[in-house]
Amino acid sequence: MPNRIFIDTLFVIALINRRDQYHQQALDLAEQFEGDPLLVTDAVLLEIGNALARSYKQEAVEIIEQFLAAEEVEVVHLTPRLFAQGLTLYKSHQDKAWGLVDCISFIVMREAGVNQALTFDQHFVQAGFQALMREFPRT
């Protein structure tokens, strides 16, 4: 069984937005990892909904519902403990421009033993993870 891969907001935005500079790369990676076990947090799902609300709301609803229904996608729910851990990480890295949702993602990835993320976000690399969209060439 392949290792789980974390889904980040920036990947989903690139996947949905045809004008995004990473759109084709996101499509290619989605095809490459189709059926593989995936991991996402409901905080990321909230971020997806917010980011796509203006221009791609229907597409956001569809992909969020697909993630929630898919057997290969594990959705980690935000608990008070997880929020507190994420906030602690967020506060302790004043030298980084990491967002709170990213910090929560990093905690979840570490606890789940996940090293790869579908993202091009440099913050994941700074935190010691592989940002797959940075490693696979754009087409």
Spans of model-derived segments:
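A generic structural signal for short hydrophobic patches within well-formed alpha-helices
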Residues: 12, 45, 124-125
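Non-catalytic, surface-exposed connector residues within folded enzymatic/regulatory domains
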Residues: 23-24, 42, 61, 77-80, ...
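Short acidic, glycine/proline-enriched helix-loop-strand junctions
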Residues: 67-70, 74-79, 87, 93-95, ...
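Acidic, PIN/NYN-like endoribonuclease modules and their adjacent C-terminal/linker elements
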Residues: 2, 106, 112-139
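Short secondary-structure boundary segments
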Residues: 42-43, 102, 121-122
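Active-site neighborhoods of divalent-metal-dependent phosphate/nucleic-acid chemistry enzymes
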Residues: 75-116
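Short, well-structured N-terminal submotif of metal-dependent ribonuclease cores
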Residues: 1-40, 53-64, 136-139
